[in-house]
Regions:
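A structural signal for conserved, well-ordered secondary-structure elements
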Residues: 1-735
């Protein structure tokens, strides 16, 4: 929606007739979660957020990215039906006196049938205005919708039906009445949805398993909509108040700026790779191009919506792909320096780089899969892009570039040693000897973060997190988003960034603006907009809750905790417990400090920055694992003090760490310089994250591993060699 626009439905939640209490915040949250579940199957990247105390706003993205396109009326009709149905399913037995004559007498007041009720059949739109068919039912509900455990649409002989499964009392009651009336060729049961009859049943036999079928003149769309709604019933009655289309959240200019920034970033990255790796850098660009083509191709095949969070995933994917190539080329540089032939050097470089690439990308993939499983909304969109990106990155780095090198080597087109521009080669810096200095820097940054967040508190949070006041008004002819934003800024001085959205009623030509401002400022902004002549007629105002709240916040938190837990287990399994402590500590260190610096620089924490922080987390763990892989390799093959071996490993990966950071920074700085205001906060946070992540992979992660192993008296070399021994088959021999 931030890149394509969409359609917005504003729902009023009304209590059901039998409800005694007014709509509560719990009712609102339950309705939000139910509608999300209903729409997930038919609409991707749907946003459902609370508005006021008894409303919900549902945003559906356009599929083509054209906010002015003609809306697919069939799809809108399907969504409208899903939004308005409470989907309360009730099954009644028909009354013994069920016949048109008796029903007519009851309606005219000429007769009374105790313990009965009249129900009408649901009417198709084409039959509206005609007298509906009716049945006389027993007053007591036979089976309630709460007993439904499954509902699925299926096609049988060209007719669409719905199969329902009941448990508990529903299953028991269905078994009893079906046995009693089995074989009676008379309508004995009516199935009601939201008080209207959708089907009437004749029992052809005993139903002991709790399954029944609803048949009627359903289209495929109607059957699917009913099945989804029955699986997710609502305890309230939703009513559509407004139905409007809206343009992209990011203006077309911002989108174009983002595209230009991406082109600049890729161009500068290509230039950078060619300078440092020369001919090998050109091969890497072939792999990177294949990576990007495959990524966007797969996203298009699965019709995944591309969002700002998706851009974050693409940036991290490009960083990971470049890192894989840098790892291979740094190994290739070492093998060529050792005097090996081109063919042998290429083979050895890929073999030695494989474990670092595999472990680094698998840990990032674990994070993406956990987010995909547990998270929602924009975070899930990030996870989809990143998951696909990691898989294609492995393919392009390990297969595409290797095929190119092998072909060139086999055809003798590449028979001279490859040349590279040396970067920080043969350095012997005592990084672990600088632990006191790095500890001081980290502690100082953490203290600054704590003080900044402690002082600013809710001031550091955007409207998505804390809620605020919402204004809604018809725009005057002279009104524009820029005018409204300027008026709000001048009125409130230092304020949270207002959220302004332009809306157009479906089928109408008027312009409506929806404005979200910080809590308690609605009345002041309302007066300012009126005085400025930006509104026609009355301005509606109400309080709104946070967009990131309730179930979404909990699921995202669970996803984060689960992701950290799985990474911890994987690193422990692949390396050793001390390494897992170092990896998680460095990751938390990076995120905490980046959040602190971002807030200190006056940025608001919002959904855009959530995507940036996820990118930073992926980059941080990837960077750390690469260093750990070299430490593990050196501990296997070198003798001497563990501290010296760890220093040697960090120095050996220093050029790779710096080069990967620089190539990633090139892309992100391009976004900062050319991406426009919309991408400013996003790119700023990632720049800080890359710098902090580079620092922590050198000065934080490895020193923590060494400190923990020393404190717990763990022999890192012995632990790693023992793990290797466990992996050796019984028939293998060692020297």
């Amino acid at each position: 929606m931030d890149l394509a626009g969409g359609v917005r439905f504003t729902l009023q939640l009304n209590k059901r007739a039998e409800a005694k209490e007014p709509i509560s915040s719990k009712d609102q949250e339950e309705a939000l979660n139910v509608l999300k579940k209903r729409l997930t199957g038919s609409v991707s990247n749907v946003d459902v957020v609370p508005e006021g105390k008894d409303r919900l706003v549902v945003d559906i993205p356009h599929e083509t990215g054209d906010a002015n396109q003609n809306i697919d009326e069939d799809k809108i009709k399907q969504i409208r039906a899903q939004l308005q149905k409470s989907a309360i399913l009730e099954l009644y037995l028909t009354h013994e006196q069920n016949n048109p004559v008796t029903i007519g007498k009851i309606e005219r007041g000429e007769d009374v049938v105790p313990f009965s009720k009249i129900a009408e059949y649901a009417q198709p739109e084409e039959e509206s205005g005609e007298e509906p068919r009716k049945l006389l039912l027993k007053e007591e509900i036979l089976i309630k919708g709460e007993d439904v455990t499954a509902a699925n649409a299926f096609n049988e002989n060209g007719r669409w039906k719905i199969n329902i499964t009941f448990e508990g009392d529903g299953k028991k009651n269905l078994a009893e009445v079906s046995m009693k009336y089995a074989g009676d060729n008379v309508t004995k049961m009516a199935i009601l949805l939201d008080g209207e009859i959708i089907s009437a049943a004749v029992f052809s036999g005993h139903i002991p398993g709790g399954n029944c079928q609803i048949s009627g003149d359903f289209t495929q769309q109607e059957a699917n909509t009913l099945a989804v709604s029955m699986r997710n019933p609502l305890g309230v009655k939703p009513e559509i108040l407004y139905e409007e289309s809206f343009p992209p959240t990011l203006a077309n200019e911002a989108i174009n700026q983002g595209i230009r920034a991406g082109i600049w970033g890729l161009g500068l990255t290509a230039f950078f790779m060619a300078i440092f790796y020369r001919f090998a850098g050109l091969i890497a660009l072939i792999g990177l191009s294949m990576n990007i083509i495959l990524l966007f191709g797969i996203l298009a095949i699965f019709q995944a919506d591309f969002t700002l969070a998706g851009i974050a995933g693409v940036i991290l994917t490009i960083g990971i792909a470049i890192d894989a190539n840098v790892l291979i080329f740094e190994r290739l540089r070492e093998e060529m320096a050792a005097g090996k032939t081109v063919g042998i050097a290429i083979q050895t470089a890929y073999e030695k780089a494989f474990s670092a690439i595999f472990d680094a990308q698998i840990t990032t993939l674990i994070t993406a899969l956990v987010l995909l499983w547990l998270a929602e909304g924009a975070i899930q969109g990030f996870a989809v892009t990143l998951t696909i990106g990691i898989i294609v990155s492995l393919f392009s780095a390990l297969l595409v570039t290797r095929v190119c090198f092998n072909w060139l080597s086999a055809t003798r087109k590449l028979n001279k040693p490859l040349k590279f521009t040396p970067v920080l080669s043969n350095k012997k810096i005592n990084f672990l000897g600088l632990t006191k200095f790095s500890r001081f820097i980290s502690v100082a940054l953490i203290v600054v973060t704590i003080l900044t967040i402690g002082i600013k508190k809710e001031e550091s949070l955007g409207i998505e997190f804390v809620g605020g006041d919402q204004l809604r008004f018809n725009a005057s002819e002279s009104a524009s988003i820029e005018d409204i934003k300027k008026t709000i800024t001048e009125t409130l001085n230092e304020t949270k960034t207002p959220q302004i959205q332009k809306l157009t009623p479906i089928g109408g030509d008027s312009t409506i603006y929806s404005v979200r401002v910080e809590p308690g400022s609605g009345e002041k902004v309302k007066q300012a907009i009126t005085i400025a002549g930006l509104a026609e007629g009355q301005i509606q105002s109400q309080q709104i809750g946070s967009v990131i709240a309730g179930e979404m916040a909990k699921r995202s938190l669970y996803a984060l905790i689960a992701g950290l837990g799985v990474i911890f287990i994987y690193v422990t399994f692949r390396f050793e417990f001390s390494f897992a402590i170092g990896a998680i500590a460095a990751l938390i260190h990076d995120l905490f400090i980046v959040i602190g610096i971002t807030v200190l620089c006056g940025k608001e924490l919002n959904l855009i920055l959530v995507g940036a922080f996820l990118t930073i987390a992926g980059y941080s763990i990837n960077d750390t694992i690469v260093v750990f892989d070299r430490i593990r390799e050196n501990l296997r093959s070198q003798r001497g003090d563990v501290k010296d071996i760890m220093n040697t490993a960090i120095n050996a990966t220093l050029s790779r760490t710096i080069l990967t950071s620089l190539t990633t920074l090139i892309t992100v700085v391009s976004l900062l310089l050319f991406g426009g205001p919309a991408l400013n906060d996003f790119s700023f946070a990632i720049i800080i994250g890359v710098i902090v992540g580079t620092y922590s992979s050198i000065f934080v992660a490895s020193p923590i591993v060494y400190w923990w192993a020393k404190k717990k008296k763990v022999n890192l070399r012995r632990e790693i060699l023992d793990a290797d021994q466990d992996d050796i088959s019984p028939t293998a021999t060692t020297n």
